[in-house]
Amino acid sequence: MLRPIRGSRGRSVTTAIDPHSLLMLAQSRHPADRERLLEDMVDYCGQAELDELNAPAMREMIGSLFMTLVAEAERDIRRRLAEKIAPAPWAPQALINVLALDDIEIAAPVISASPVLQDHDLIRLLVESTLDHQIAIARRGRLSSPVIEAILKQEEPAVLTALAGNDTADISRSAMEKLVDHSRRVAAMRSPLARHPRLSSDMAQRLYLWVGQSLRTALVGRFRLDP
């Protein structure tokens, strides 16, 4: 028996679904069928109970459906899907990795918020994705040390600047020292580094040597440096 709920646009969305019937519809050659099903699944996942979504059979069914549908889904539908499932711990790993490599407008919410993305996924993305994707990774909250080290090795100025502005990243002292060193040639890094909570007084003293007057004043005020 199907139990309907109302979708975000007033459409009926089922919360008990026959996997065989849905997979048949997902394999339909009619674009309208595939589009309708993906929209219903997006609405469903946005409203279903977490325990229901975490059930093994449901996780397998959702993963198969999304991977079948997303390959031919239009851009705006993929974007809606990414926004809906970005923070979801139940999201299929394969789907999240596919969306993370999509156009940046689609990938950004997934890169920023998905708890499904692991360090090795993010490091792989740094190698395989565009500069915009790499910047989004550097801005991700609570970025781990292995990912930070991968960013530092690439030495991409725009990505380093994004990392310098990430106050929640787990930046070690040695990584912070490397960022300060990079700021000598990358001027855009200087202002966020001067405000960074992990900047120490000895690092500030080095940073002071190549920043402008306004940042020098800020550093002196913050660390009581001897100009």
Name each region found by the language model.
Residues 2-227:
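Alpha-helical scaffold segments
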